[in-house]
Amino acid sequence: QTNIDLLKMKIPNKKYITNKESGSKIIQYIHDDLSYLVKKDRVTYKKEYLDFSKILKERLEFFDEIAISNTLNFIQDIEDDIYIKFNITELQRVIDNNLSNAIKYSFAKSSIFIKLAYINDDEIEFTTTTHSKKIENVKKIFDDFYRENIARGGFGLGLKIVKDICDKNLVIINLDSNEKNTKFAYRFKINEDTIT
């Protein structure tokens, strides 16, 4: 990463620098997913009060280079100072897998809409909305190794990780997909405990 930063200082705004940085971030994201899979059954992921708004903005900044290299952009609607009781590693896996999939499956030169907002005094909702092909098999999309479009790459593990984390933490998932848009919505209780 340091070498890429030096190149950016010497040759600013070059497309191949963006692509190289994008590639390094994809590798880091995949590593984080695999690391979680290896550790999840033998590590206790303790909860703490987290600034969801701040973390989401930081992850959007991380994925911005990847979006740009895929001719996409993020449009954010994030309420400030939304705090929840959650584990930082698990929250990041939920966010990262959704942002990665949004980039992977969006139509070229389109926008990805990211929203985080209170829906009542006890619950918040995190949503990603993309202009993309309709998901044909909604029931299987969260299964191990399932991929709607093999040509898009990936391992088919990301959404399984997301579902396991959401089930464990009582996060409600809603998926709406049609011919024009796909929307993933995650409803978090602000002080929810895990399933014992």
Question: At which residue positions do the language-model features occur?
Answer:
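Conserved DHp (HisKA) dimerization/phosphotransfer helix of two-component histidine kinases, i.e.
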Residues: 2-6, 10-66
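Conserved catalytic submotifs in the C-terminal HATPase_c
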Residues: 48, 68, 73-83, 119
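Short helix-loop "hinge" at the ATP-lid/N-box region of the Bergerat-fold HATPase_c
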Residues: 102-103
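Short conserved segment of the HATPase_c
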Residues: 134-145
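Glycine-rich phosphate-binding loop
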Residues: 152-161
